[in-house]
C-alpha cells in the first residue's frame, strides 16, 4: 500500500444511505439517538485528548483498542462487543483525518491558538453521519493489524500518547516522534505517569466503594439458595449455572468481601488513592505485598497439598506465583469492584502493581493474620479450580511408604469421609475447606484434643496443629515423667495408641493428620516387649540387660564340659576356647573346674547385684585370669 486511499476510492465503495456505522449500531442495538450523540461526543473527546488523529488508524492499533475499551465500559457493553467498538473508533479516526485535510488552514490555526472547542464542534458536525465513513471499515479484517509483542505495544503506546507539543513544529505541521535517545526519556516518563494515574484511579474505586458490595453480591455467579447444596454440587454442575461470567474466572464474593472491607478501611490505601504525583514512593510497599502473596501461596500448597510429590508441589507453586496468574488474581479480586475492565490494562504496569500495593497496604495497617488468612482462602479456591486432579489427590489416603509426605486432609472432614471414594463427599471436602475463617480463631478449627493415660490417671491437652510441630517420643515421655511423678527408674516406658507401640515417625503422622477425633495415648512399661523389635522408641532410661545369675531356674553350666556328648554345653565350649586364646595362657585346673554355680550363689546372697552393671572381664596371665577369681557372666541369655 503506497499511500493513503484517495477520497474518490471512499466514495466508490460507499453504500448509499446505509453506511458501516449504521450497521454497527443495528448490530449493537444502539438505537437511542440521545445516547448515541453522547457516545459520539465522548468518542471525539477521547480521540482529541489522546491525539489519535495525528496518525493513521493502521499505525495505532493498540491505542484504538484502549479507547474502544473505555467507551465500551462507560456505555455498559460486554467484552464480546469489543470488535464493534474498535471499528467505531477506527472509523471516527479516519473521518477526523479526512475532515482535517479538507480544512487544513482552519485546523492549523486552531491548534496554533491552543483552543480545541471549535475543532471539536466542526468534527462533531461532520463525523457522525454515515456518508463520511466507508463501509470498508466495517469489512476490515484483523489481518490489517500488524502483530506486535507486549514490548512493541508499550513502545507504540509511549510514542502515541505524548503531549501535543512534542509532535508539533513551529509552522503547525505534525511529525511523528522519532525514537531518539533524547525523546525517549520524556516519553517513558509520560507513559509511566499515565499508568500511575490508572493505578491511583483503581485504588480510589476500591477505597470509595464505587461498586457497592450489595451490587457485587447480586452479580456473584456463585450465589445460590443453599450454601450446603452449592458446596456439594458446584464443582460437578458448573456448566449448568446460568451466568455470562465463567465460574473458573471469578472468586466467590464471600471470599473477596473480607479483603474489600479491609481495603475500604485502610489508611494506606486511602493515601495511595489520593496520591497526586508518582507512586514510586510506595516501592517498599509493593515489595511487602508481593512477598505476602508469595508467602500465602507457599502456605496453601504446604498446608493442603503436602501429600503430593515434590515435583507437583513445585510446579503448582511456580505456576501460581507466575506474573500471568498473579495478574489474573488481581482481575478476580478487584474486577467486580470497579467500573473499569482490568483485563484491558497492562499486566505489569497496572494489574500487578494494583495487587501488590493494595495487599501491602492492608498488611501494613492490619497485620499479617487478618490479611493472609482471607487471601489464603482465595488462593486455595483458585488452586482447587485450576488443578482438580491435585484436589482429588489431596483427598486420597497417604501411602504407607516412609518416603512419602504425610497427608494433611482438610480440617473439617473426618477420616472416614476422606477414605470414601464417592464424588459427592470428595467435592464436599474440597468446598468446605474454602469457607471463611476469622484470623483470631484460625487455630480453633484445627486443634486436636490429646488425652494421655498412665495407670488409673489421665490428663487432657490441646495441641495447636498450625503453630506447633509434632512432638517426639522422648519429649512426651519426659513430660509425662514429671506430670505423673514417675520415680521408678528401673522400668522402661513407651507410648501406645490403640495397643500399638509408637515411634517418632508414627507419632508425627498421628499428630499431623487433621481430624476432629481425639488422640488417646497410653504410657506403659515396655520391659516385657522383646528387645529385637526395631520399632521400640528410645525410653526414659535404657533397658536393663538380664543375665544368667538373675534366673535361678537355669541349670548350672560348667565352663569346660565333663561330657563332650552333652549338646546343651557345646555353645559355651567354643566361647571358653576363645577366652583361652585371648588370655594367651592356659587356665589352671581349679579355674577350669569353676562353674557358674559360684556366680549364681554369689548373686543370690547379694540382692543388689541385679541393680548394678555387670563388670567387664579383665584378662591377665596369672592364675587368677579374671577379677575376684570368678568367671564373667554372659550378657545375653543363650537360646537353649
From Swiss-Prot:
GO (cellular component) term, any one: nucleus
BP-aspect Gene Ontology terms: cellular response to biotin starvation; positive regulation of transcription by RNA polymerase II; regulation of transcription by RNA polymerase II
Compositionally biased region (Polar residues): 621-631
Positions of post-translational Phosphoserine modification: 409
Superkingdom field: Eukaryota
Positions with biased composition (Low complexity): 118-128, 588-608
Disordered as annotated region, ranges: 118-139, 580-640
Keywords: Cytoplasm, DNA-binding, Nucleus, Phosphoprotein, Transcription, Transcription regulation
Disulfide feature: none
Additional facts recorded: Present with 279 molecules/cell in log phase SD medium.
Function, as annotated: Transcription factor that binds to the VHRE consensus sequence in promoters of VHT1 and BIO5, and regulates their biotin-dependent expression.
Name of the protein in its database record: Transcription factor VHR1
Source organism: Saccharomyces cerevisiae (strain ATCC 204508 / S288c) (Baker's yeast)
Organism ancestry: Eukaryota, Fungi, Dikarya, Ascomycota, Saccharomycotina
Amino acid at each position: 500500500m503506497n499511500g493513503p486511499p484517495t477520497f474518490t476510492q471512499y466514495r466508490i465503495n460507499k453504500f448509499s444511505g446505509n453506511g458501516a456505522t449504521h450497521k454497527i449500531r443495528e448490530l449493537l442495538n444502539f438505537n437511542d439517538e440521545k445516547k448515541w450523540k453522547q457516545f459520539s461526543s465522548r468518542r471525539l473527546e477521547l480521540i482529541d485528548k489522546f491525539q489519535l488523529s495525528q496518525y493513521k488508524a493502521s499505525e495505532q492499533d493498540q491505542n484504538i483498542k484502549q479507547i474502544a475499551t473505555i467507551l465500551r465500559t462507560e456505555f455498559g457493553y460486554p467484552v464480546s462487543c469489543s470488535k464493534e467498538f474498535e471499528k467505531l473508533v477506527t472509523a471516527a479516526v479516519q473521518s477526523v483525518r479526512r475532515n482535517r485535510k479538507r480544512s487544513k488552514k482552519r485546523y492549523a490555526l486552531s491548534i496554533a491558538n491552543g483552543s480545541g472547542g471549535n475543532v471539536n464542534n466542526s468534527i462533531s458536525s461532520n463525523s457522525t453521519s454515515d456518508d463520511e465513513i466507508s463501509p470498508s471499515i466495517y469489512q476490515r479484517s484483523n489481518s490489517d493489524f500488524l502483530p506486535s509483542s507486549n514490548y512493541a505495544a508499550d513502545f507504540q503506546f509511549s510514542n502515541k500518547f505524548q503531549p501535543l507539543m512534542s509532535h508539533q513544529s513551529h509552522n503547525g505541521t505534525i511529525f511523528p516522534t522519532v525514537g531518539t535517545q533524547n525523546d525517549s526519556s520524556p516519553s517513558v516518563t509520560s507513559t509511566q505517569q499515565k499508568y500511575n494515574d490508572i493505578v491511583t484511579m483503581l485504588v480510589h474505586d476500591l477505597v470509595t466503594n464505587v461498586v457497592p458490595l450489595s451490587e457485587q453480591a447480586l452479580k456473584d455467579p456463585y450465589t445460590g439458595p443453599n450454601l450446603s447444596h452449592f458446596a456439594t454440587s458446584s464443582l460437578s454442575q458448573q456448566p449448568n449455572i446460568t451466568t455470562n461470567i465463567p465460574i473458573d474466572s471469578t472468586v466467590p464474593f464471600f471470599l473477596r468481601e473480607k479483603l474489600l472491607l479491609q481495603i475500604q478501611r485502610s489508611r494506606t490505601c486511602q493515601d495511595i488513592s489520593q496520591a497526586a504525583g508518582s507512586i514510586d514512593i510506595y516501592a517498599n510497599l509493593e515489595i511487602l505485598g508481593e512477598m505476602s502473596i508469595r508467602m500465602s501461596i507457599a502456605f496453601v500448597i504446604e498446608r493442603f497439598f503436602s501429600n503430593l510429590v515434590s515435583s507437583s508441589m513445585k510446579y503448582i507453586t511456580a505456576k501460581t506465583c507466575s506474573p500471568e496468574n498473579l495478574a489474573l488474581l488481581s482481575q478476580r479480586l478487584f474486577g467486580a469492584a470497579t467500573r473499569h475492565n482490568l483485563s484491558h490494562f497492562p499486566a505489569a504496569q497496572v494489574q500487578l502493581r494494583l495487587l501488590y500495593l493494595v495487599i501491602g497496604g492492608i498488611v501494613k495497617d492490619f497485620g499479617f493474620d487478618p490479611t493472609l488468612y482471607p487471601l489464603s482462602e482465595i488462593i486455595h479456591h483458585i488452586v482447587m479450580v485450576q488443578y482438580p486432579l491435585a484436589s482429588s489427590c489431596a483427598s486420597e489416603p497417604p501411602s504407607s511408604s516412609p518416603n512419602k509426605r504425610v497427608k494433611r486432609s482438610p480440617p473439617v472432614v473426618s477420616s472416614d469421609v476422606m477414605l470414601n471414594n464417592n464424588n459427592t463427599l470428595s467435592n464436599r471436602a474440597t468446598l468446605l475447606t474454602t469457607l471463611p475463617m476469622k484470623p483470631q480463631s484460625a487455630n480453633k478449627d484445627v486443634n486436636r484434643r490429646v488425652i494421655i493415660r498412665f495407670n488409673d490417671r489421665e490428663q487432657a491437652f490441646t495441641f495447636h496443629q498450625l503453630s506447633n510441630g509434632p512432638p517426639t517420643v522422648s519429649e512426651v515421655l519426659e513430660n509425662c515423667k514429671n506430670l505423673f511423678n514417675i520415680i521408678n527408674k528401673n522400668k522402661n516406658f513407651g507410648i501406645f495408641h490403640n495397643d500399638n507401640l509408637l515411634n517418632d515417625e508414627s507419632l508425627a503422622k498421628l499428630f499431623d493428620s487433621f481430624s476432629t477425633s481425639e488422640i488417646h495415648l497410653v504410657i506403659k512399661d515396655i520391659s516385657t516387649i522383646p528387645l529385637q523389635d526395631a520399632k521400640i522408641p528410645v525410653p526414659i532410661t535404657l533397658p536393663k540387660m538380664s543375665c544368667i545369675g538373675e534366673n535361678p531356674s537355669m541349670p548350672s553350666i560348667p565352663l569346660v564340659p565333663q561330657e563332650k556328648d552333652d549338646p546343651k554345653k557345646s555353645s559355651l565350649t567354643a566361647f571358653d576356647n576363645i577366652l583361652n586364646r585371648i588370655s594367651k595362657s592356659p587356665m589352671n585346673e581349679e579355674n577350669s573346674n569353676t562353674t557358674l554355680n559360684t556366680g549364681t550363689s554369689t548373686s543370690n546372697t547379694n540382692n543388689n547385684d541385679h541393680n548394678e552393671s555387670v563388670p567387664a572381664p579383665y584378662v591377665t596371665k596369672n592364675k587368677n585370669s579374671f577379677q575376684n577369681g570368678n568367671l564373667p557372666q554372659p550378657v545375653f541369655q543363650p537360646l537353649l
